[in-house]
Amino acid sequence: ASYCKQELEKHDGVKVYMVRDSYSCPFGGGSVKSTECNSKRVEFSKNVKADLYISFHLNSSGPSARGVSVYYPNMNYKSEIGRNGEVLAKDIIKRLKALGIPQQGRGTLIRNSENNTRYPDGSLADYLAVIKGNKYNNIPAVLIEHCFISNASDCEQFLSSEEKLRTLGVADANGIM
């Protein structure tokens, strides 16, 4: 994320806000995975009038799982946010795939509510809290799962040095711009 920020800030008029730099919630309340922390990050993006919200992650599963995924908003409720998110997700994944990160059945994805949560118009809501919350605030959000930290090959090829991390960050930035 920090390398992406550095690359984005080379462009005039681009302001990047980082909502965390450690595993603790910068807004209090414990883990960054907590509902409260996610809500506060979404609120922060609204308060700074963000144009986009990008959530950086590494996936984890069994040792054979590989590949890149970028989640974006569904087309329900505020479909323009979904369309903008889809364009952004496709641009980012194109750059990451160009680095050699496989898709292996992943790619650009929508994840809908698994417990029938609905938007105000009655349509099925997005599952991911930062995507759903930012949609309410008219901010396209994507969540990037760069590769699998649980896969030795992914770790060696894409995560094993600062230069490799920088390459990921530059690819993310180029997809965003």
Q: Can you describe what each PLM-predicted range is?
A:
Residues S55, N59-S61, L109-M177:
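Active-site-adjacent mobile loop/cap segments within catalytic or ligand-binding domains
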Residues K15-V16, Q103, A141:
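Hydrophobic anchor at the start of a short beta-strand
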